[in-house]
């Protein structure tokens, strides 16, 4: 059985010209006449034509506009203080703030590989309000060349904000590049991540 993979904005981008099948599984959109009988309309009568208005409605434009409206009206859209990731590189310190509120320190792995820090989080399937869910993410950030890799630290605040930080050294000193794991410590107080 072949599976059609498409971007969700353009599920019906070509309207009636798109070779749609009932098994494409566009749940929640309703069925259109060409979903049930794609070739029947032209085989019954050669004079049958679908209305232009119906073609425009089915073409995906209305879906695109609806999707854009929902994206623009989400509370986090365009609001930098609700951004879950923040990377800051000051003169004397490099800091990464990452929102990982669905993970415990045991679910997180932080490693330094040469000039990169890799943060991986995974928890097995567990029950939440809507059913069962499992989550996994993998982030990779390039460390500035002057970060002292022997003094890197990582902590998880009570509100689920992971803070990875490391001091910078003067340009004449060697920062040291090796692979090592960074333990994640738990803090009892909420994060003091900047809101801008």
UniProtKB/Swiss-Prot annotation:
The keyword GTP-binding does not apply. Acetylation at Lys-93 may increase chaperone activity. Undergoes age-dependent proteolytical cleavage at the C-terminus. Residues 168-196 are annotated as: Disordered. It is found in: Cytoplasm; Nucleus. Keywords: Acetylation, Chaperone, Cytoplasm, Eye lens protein, Glycoprotein, Metal-binding, Methylation, Nucleus, Phosphoprotein, Zinc. Zn(2+) 1 binds at residues 123, 125. Zn(2+) 2 binds at residue 130. The modification N-acetylmethionine is found at residue 1. InterPro entries: A-crystallin/Hsp20_dom, Alpha-crystallin/sHSP_animal, Alpha-crystallin_N, HSP20-like_chaperone. Contributes to the transparency and refractive index of the lens. Acts as a chaperone, preventing aggregation of various proteins under a wide range of stress conditions. Required for the correct formation of lens intermediate filaments as part of a complex composed of BFSP1, BFSP2 and CRYAA. Belongs to the small heat shock protein (HSP20) family. This is Alpha-crystallin A chain. It comes from Mesocricetus auratus (Golden hamster). The gene is CRYAA.
